[in-house]
Amino acid sequence: PACLEREPLTRAVVTGYAAKVTAEDRAVQRDAFIAAMVWGYGRVGYGPSRVERIMAQPGFEEQLADVTRITLEQGGPAAFEHIRQQRKSGVGCLKHLGAAFGTKYLSFLTKAHRESDIAPVLDSVVRAWFAKHAKDVDVRIGGGWTYPDRYRTYV
């Protein structure tokens, strides 16, 4: 979104983009997705090329719309499971989007639209915190979207 060039991209700003999301408006979904990715990658030089690669995949907008609808209606873990099932069946879903960055989008959506069951980000920073402070909880997710039940333990 063009306005990302004018304001610091804080969690509150990205949550504001997510708050505008509906299950129908793909342009707003795309803006919220981009905001979450820019927030996640920060100032690293390879962020834009990775996001462009994801968004250039055939079916990206339809897949993002499905994930968005499921997140809004059923929550982050259901969307996580949907991505896993689509990939496992060979259909594919948001190719090149890993769980660490995909859960950023899910997290902002649930934070903006749900009063409880906020889906957290599932990245190395969060996993390290759990490893240090909640040693009895197994939050390892393997190489991607492979353990939706473990993601549910976060929620």
Give the residues covered by each predicted segment.
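Non-catalytic alpha-helical scaffold/packing segments enriched in small hydrophobic residues
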Residues: 101-104, 125
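Catalytic Zn2+-binding segment of zinc metalloproteases
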Residues: 103-114
